Amino acid sequence: IRLFKKKKVDIFTNNLKKTYPKGQSVEIINSDIILKTLNAVSKNKGYKEHVTSYFYANKRKFKIHNFNLKNNISSINLSIDTLFDFNFVKKVIELSDDKYIGLNMLIKIHNKIKKL
């Protein structure tokens, strides 16, 4: 949030160039921008469920800042859509020594699981 405020942008995201694990997407949108574009967004059925698609489709109209990691770890999947995904995340939790799993620990555990 601090970086979003500091950059003074309309949208602050990690979705344009994906470097974070799947399931770890972040989109912070200035509420004034949402209010200003509500009418345009509501007219298109395609944007009703995924409002942010409107901003990306019209990115020349908005100040969008993408933040990313130096090391791309987007191949790691933390989204739970299947039983396989669930079992992977369950294994990550089981292999963790702590309740909090930071990014560096996540990478270590992921690499450990890949070797199993």
Give the ranges of each region predicted by the language model.
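Conserved donor-nucleotide/metal-binding helix-loop-beta segment in metal-dependent transferases, i.e.
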Residues: I1-T19
